[in-house]
Amino acid sequence: MVVGKIIKISGPVVVAEGMKGSQMFEVVKVGNEGLTGEIIQLTEDEAIIQVYEETAGIKPGEGVEGTGAPLSVELGPGMLKAMYDGIQRPLNEIENATDSIYIPRGVSVPSISREIKWDFEPTAAAGDEVITGDVIGTVQETASIVHKIMIPFGVSGKIKEIKAGSFTVEETVAVVETAEGEKEIMMMQKWPVRKPRPSKGKQAPVIPLITGQRVEDTFFGLAKGGASAIPGPFGSGKTVTQHQLAKWSDVDVVVYIGCGERGNEMTEVIEEFPHLDDIKTGNKLMDRTVLIANTSNMPVAAREASVYTGITIAEYFRDQGLGVLLTADSTSRWAEAMREISGRLEEMPGEEGYPAYLSSKLAQFYERAGRVECLGSENKQGFVCIVGAVSPPGGDFSEPVTSNTLRIVKVFWALDANLARRRHFPAINWLTSYSLYIDDIAGWWQQNTAADWRSLRDEAMSLLQKEAELQEIVQLVGPDALPDRERVILEIARMLREDFLQQDAYHEVDSYCSPLKQYNMLKIIMTFYKKGLDAVAKGADPAGISAVTVKGDIARMKYLTDDEFINTKVPEIINKMESELGALIK
């Protein structure tokens, strides 16, 4: 074991000498208190270490001890419902062990409890041939998730022994005869966070991730296995949007990373999630959630670790054939931590002081999203979706973190402070947002809703763009100076904005909108548009079209349940629309 000595301390960065024989990204214990750090640079016998805990009080001359292993996470039963810090230390366990609301420096608590016994049900038998990724048994970890115990990476052979019963994560549940000898299989694995977990290959992203949010699903859809960015200034609704995604997305597991954000936002998640019901399983949402809390008052170096810890945990669940949503709030804070560490290392700064390798670091993270064919002899498919919030100072989307993120992700949900001030939520700007997955996922929508889904969506988008062009004229001369046809377009665009795009996150029904309901709502508004144009062409007054009472029914449709709306209200609204607009024709 390498033992060195501290020669320099600069905030979270420590320089130690006598470290010959150490490896890059090796975890070390720094100082007399044994603070956790990671080697990020090696020159001859000196090592530069980023420390994941507060360095106040340590001094030159204190020891640095290598562990011989990279920064790794423990993967196994017991992660769901847990709350970790950025380096996978369990916060609840630390509180119980230390009887303190603060994290003591140098504290060491296992990430996964060694005391809890889990009921292991074998799905393989002695004599079976197994390879990396094969499922040999299951554990009912929570009411929502059956945890699959897999053969770890690099192990293949014949099962010599496998037993059912209650075991801790460190006890042997199976023995595999390999070419190198017998290997004992535990329920827990370890994996280095900076190394992506392997798979057989990536699949095309052709299935949409249904979030229940109309603007995201219908207009700017994200595919399963895709990556998305949510940039927006302060108060525009980034965190609530991410909470909505965590609550309603069509996934099996949610990994929520609070990376450098305010502590009260994580508190909201911790207080709210245990009381929320999961629409897929009927159980509590927390049963399928892993929380990583790395708030703004925690050491900056741990922000980078928290992002890698979260994606490694997400990949582990993906390898079980599950769908995972990883939300990182916010990647800007992680980039700011990189900027601080880079400054301490006296590296040449890039744009706005960020390091020159900012884009490659962001790409390494987002590239770990994907829909994959999992390792193993079974035909398992899993996916990881990444949704990263970006907090550009002053809402400036041209700043380096936002612009570099845009080069990597294929979905851009741009939050607009002006919309938020007008109380239009979700405040996703339909003119600046985009999705490059629309062509890929259109087939699924047409198969599961109706063949005209794509044409309705494209027509609605063009109406909203046309409205933006007309607004300049309206502000100069007023709407009455416009031709009748364009006055109808303005009215329909307003209905699209207020009755379709606006959604109440705190309303019992409107918080989640199913794909079929989304299609029918859009269909009704676009039918009103076509019939309104016909009526105007036949002599109806646009002011009369704006005054019909069916518009009230259209405005209320978002608050109706699927069953009531699709089966009862849709034909009623269409009939009422036809009779009222027909009566306007002279």
UniProtKB/Swiss-Prot annotation:
ATP binds at residues 232-239. Its EC number is 7.1.2.2. The keyword Endoplasmic reticulum does not apply. Gene3D superfamilies: 2.40.30.20, 2.40.50.100, Bovine Mitochondrial F1-atpase, Atp Synthase Beta Chain, Chain D, domain 3, P-loop containing nucleotide triphosphate hydrolases. PROSITE patterns: ATPASE_ALPHA_BETA (PS00152). The keyword Cell membrane applies. GO terms for cellular component: plasma membrane; proton-transporting two-sector ATPase complex, catalytic domain. GO terms for molecular function: ATP binding; proton-transporting ATP synthase activity, rotational mechanism; proton-transporting ATPase activity, rotational mechanism. It is a peripheral membrane protein. It is found in: Cell membrane. It catalyses: ATP + H2O + 4 H(+)(in) = ADP + phosphate + 5 H(+)(out). It is an enzyme of class 7 (translocase). GO terms for biological process: proton motive force-driven plasma membrane ATP synthesis. Its main location: membrane. InterPro entries: ATP-synt_VA_C, ATP-synth_a_Xtn, ATP_synth_asu-like_sf, ATP_synth_asu_arc, ATPase_a/bsu_AS, ATPase_F1/V1/A1_a/bsu_N, ATPase_F1/V1/A1_a/bsu_N_sf, ATPase_F1/V1/A1_a/bsu_nucl-bd. Pfam families: ATP-synt_ab, ATP-synt_ab_N, ATP-synt_ab_Xtn, ATP-synt_VA_C. Keywords: ATP synthesis, ATP-binding, Cell membrane, Hydrogen ion transport, Ion transport, Membrane, Nucleotide-binding, Translocase, Transport. Has multiple subunits with at least A(3), B(3), C, D, E, F, H, I and proteolipid K(x). HAMAP family: ATP_synth_A_arch. Component of the A-type ATP synthase that produces ATP from ADP in the presence of a proton gradient across the membrane. The A chain is the catalytic subunit. Belongs to the ATPase alpha/beta chains family. This is A-type ATP synthase subunit A.
